[in-house]
Regions:
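Short glycine-rich loop/turn motifs that provide flexible caps or phosphate-binding loops at active sites
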Residues: 20-24, 50, 58, 97, ...
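Gly/Ser/Thr-rich beta-alpha loop segments that engage phosphate groups in nucleotides
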Residues: 25-27, 31, 48, 53, ...
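A glycine/threonine-rich phosphate-anchoring loop and its flanking beta-alpha core
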Residues: 36-120, 124-125
Length: 181
């Protein structure tokens, strides 16, 4: 929260016309938090595979409690995917963030707001990520697999953004916030 506050103040001081977030989910989340109060458009350049760059959702952990906010001002206006920027992401973190994207897609299949189009996107995301992640763990420099993982994450984030969070995320946020996971 303090980082977001400082970021908003700095953006105001320099008269920024957008918030650029390059990195994983926490960095993308910081960009969202800055945009929430400042209404700056977000340019997101993800370097992991969870897909949060495609959602208007922000998770905040404060005093051991994880909460989420949903606001259209936090949906990045532009997302740039560049698989080259993921090449230094260790294979283990690649697999972890990709599994998070798969969890987003599975969740979209049973969410209350699920629909046939989102289900097709979720199934494609799961298929692509299930193929790409083992390739990345075997060869972390496999650019084609990393590009496929970004495609799968894009789909997964789109699913989560469309249907919102279901049981899986609610449990993870409760346990994660409570036990600092």
């Amino acid at each position: 929260i303090e980082s977001a506050r400082a970021g908003r103040e700095e953006a105001k001081r320099v008269n920024a016309d957008c918030a650029i977030a390059i990195g994983g989910g926490s960095t993308i989340g910081l960009g969202k938090a800055i945009a929430l109060d400042s209404s700056l458009p977000i340019l997101a350049i993800p370097t992991t595979y969870a897909g949060s760059e495609m959602t208007p959702i922000l998770g905040i952990t404060e005093n051991g409690i994880k909460t989420t906010l949903r606001d259209g001002r936090m949906l990045p206006k532009t997302v740039i995917y560049d698989a080259d920027l993921t090449l230094t992401l260790p294979a283990k973190l690649s697999a972890t963030s990709g599994m998070n994207a798969i969890a987003h897609s599975v969740e979209a299949l049973y969410a209350k707001e699920a629909n046939p189009i989102i289900s097709l996107m979720a199934e494609e995301s799961i298929r692509v990520l299930a193929d790409a992640l083992p390739k990345i763990t075997r060869n972390s420099q496999d650019l084609a697999a990393r590009s496929d993982a970004q495609y799968g994450a894009w789909l997964a984030g789109g699913c989560l953004g469309a249907v919102g969070m279901a049981l899986h995320h609610k449990l993870c946020h409760t346990l994660g916030g409570s036990f600092n996971l």
